[in-house]
């Protein structure tokens, strides 16, 4: 690690990071995939779709409130805080996260985009108005309604089969085209978007460093693979980067 950073220290003008479910898992948040995603015998793939919401919005909201309750008990870990420190000290850093739990913002990250949205945002299906008003099954009839137009509210996340937000996607693509060092953190590559963005960065000349407990589908494409948990490896990596400023 140290030799790699020393050799390439002139490539640290623009640093970016892509974070995935692995960094959230280290805070105790389930991935909500596979067996971890089962809720009342439903899979995430059965509930996180526009079709599921159209068919049974109350059921979908019950699942999302269950997820919100779990996430609210969790806190950012050293991996989140290491990225905050990198943002604080490095003049040109940007974070793209697949995670919808809001832990990066809770830790203090400001230069970021939540490309899959945020689970705590409520968005109207008609007028698009967004809020973070707390919704509880005990006090709010499900599905909740928009105070502006009375249409149903939905969670402010990207569902299976939906397009990404144009602004967030274009912002991420442009950042990948103009980044020197990309940190790929806790993402398995099972979702195509991080692979797509990382490939843009690589094709544009960026160096790629991946931190993961196991090799992923694009580990063969990175310049340095560091095996381990993000919360354990990333703080050390960032100390090396900040100790060797360009």
Curated annotation (Swiss-Prot):
Compartments (UniProt record): Cytoplasm
Binding site for Zn(2+): 124, 127, 146, 149
Active site: 116 (proton acceptor)
GO molecular function, one term: NAD+ binding
Positions annotated to bind NAD(+): 20-39, 98-101, 186-188, 212-214, 230
Cofactor: Zn(2+)
Zinc listed as a keyword: yes
Entry EC number(s): 2.3.1.286
Record has Zinc as a keyword: yes
Catalysed reaction, written as an equation: N(6)-acetyl-L-lysyl-[protein] + NAD(+) + H2O = 2''-O-acetyl-ADP-D-ribose + nicotinamide + L-lysyl-[protein]; N(6)-succinyl-L-lysyl-[protein] + NAD(+) + H2O = 2''-O-succinyl-ADP-D-ribose + nicotinamide + L-lysyl-[protein]
List of residues binding substrate: 64, 67
InterPro entries, alphabetized: DHS-like_NAD/FAD-binding_dom, NAD-dep_sirtuin_deacylases, Sirtuin, Sirtuin_cat_small_dom_sf, Sirtuin_class_III, Ssirtuin_cat_dom
Keywords annotated in UniProt: Cytoplasm, Metal-binding, NAD, Transferase, Zinc
Domain of life: Bacteria
Main location per the UniProt record: cytoplasm
Record remark on domains: 2 residues (Tyr-64 and Arg-67) present in a large hydrophobic pocket are probably involved in substrate specificity. They are important for desuccinylation activity, but dispensable for deacetylation activity.
Name used for this protein in its record: NAD-dependent protein deacylase
